[in-house]
Regions:
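Conserved oxyanion/phosphate-binding beta-strand-loop segments in alpha/beta enzyme cores
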Residues: 20
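P-loop NTPase motor domains
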Residues: 2-17, 25-283
Length: 283
């Protein structure tokens, strides 16, 4: 491990020598893996690192698929009054009284080319749905066609049903009539000439299953918002704290996996727009 500095994180103590073991920001910037058997202290180690990051003023995001670590960090932040002087955002899928907004189609800062975002979102959605779009070119084309259209028109996943429904030709033609991307426009021009049965065959059952997942009632309130939605780029730049509880008690396991994957995907795309010297943020 590197020589400790003011920004280094204490990992633990060497059982043989009693020496404190630290990891430096440079080492963490390369990547960090936490490995171990069940009930061997992985979550405790992560909790310790998160607490230190918050104390040091670092930006942090915790995405907890179980909710236990989320609850511990929230209680700790309350106990030590971090809510009073740090920007802390809580996303809790178990809270039925308030649905947070997250639109994975939002562009970040200087991000101009939507192609990379379309590709990454399509892959994330297909993976969670159990589909391999690399071996299913028609499925890949259909998903990317819908996602590109929603992004270019500044829509949300809630509107996907109008693009996918074979008996909604008027709505589909209205939404696709002035697409700026020439290739996407030509594809919709062709799709809009098909009869209902032909259109239904073209998109296929796999695509509909995927759209049904991302437009489920549990996710509709999250993905269906366009204003005051989560801005991962702003959280990173401002050194904010984002705590996410994806406990399946609030949503299904597949919905939890999809939301988690899209959140990680959004952070990854936002990271690509940041400069080397920007404020450190740990996911």
């Amino acid at each position: 491990m590197g020589k400790p500095s003011k920004k280094s994180i204490l990992l633990g103590t060497d059982a043989m020598t009693g020496e404190e073991i630290y990891t430096t920001p440079k080492e963490r910037g390369a990547h960090t893996h936490v490995m171990g058997s069940t009930d061997e202290g992985k979550s405790f180690g992560l909790e310790n690192m998160i607490r230190q990051d918050i104390r040091l003023g670092n930006g942090v995001c915790l995405i907890d698929p179980h909710g236990t670590l989320y609850d511990k960090i929230v209680r700790w932040c309350v106990t030590y009054n971090f809510f009073d002087h740090r920007k802390i955002v809580l996303l809790n899928t178990s809270d039925k009284q308030w649905a947070f907004g997250f639109n994975p189609f939002n562009m970040h800062g200087s991000e101009q080319d939507i192609t990379a975002r379309v590709d990454s979102i399509a892959e994330a959605i297909a993976t969670v749905s159990g589909e391999n779009i690399d071996t299913m070119p028609q499925l890949r084309q259909s998903i990317k066609l819908v996602i590109h259209t929603l992004m270019e028109k500044n829509l949300t996943l809630h509107e996907a049903k109008y693009l996918m429904n074979p008996i909604k030709p008027k709505e589909r033609k209205y939404l696709t009539k002035d697409i700026q991307n020439a290739v996407v426009f030509e594809q919709w021009e062709h799709m809009n000439t098909l009869r209902d049965t032909e259109f239904d065959v073209k998109f296929g059952a796999s695509t509909r299953r995927i759209i049904e997942l991302i437009t489920s009632p549990a996710l509709r309130n999250i993905f269906g918002q366009t204003e005051k939605t989560l801005n991962t780029r702003a959280i990173m730049d401002e050194g904010g704290i984002l705590l996410v509880n994806l406990n399946p008690k609030g949503i299904s396991l597949s919905e939890s996996r999809l939301l988690g994957k899209l959140l990680v995907n959004d952070f990854t795309l936002a990271t690509r727009q940041r400069d080397e010297g920007d404020r450190r943020f740990y996911l």
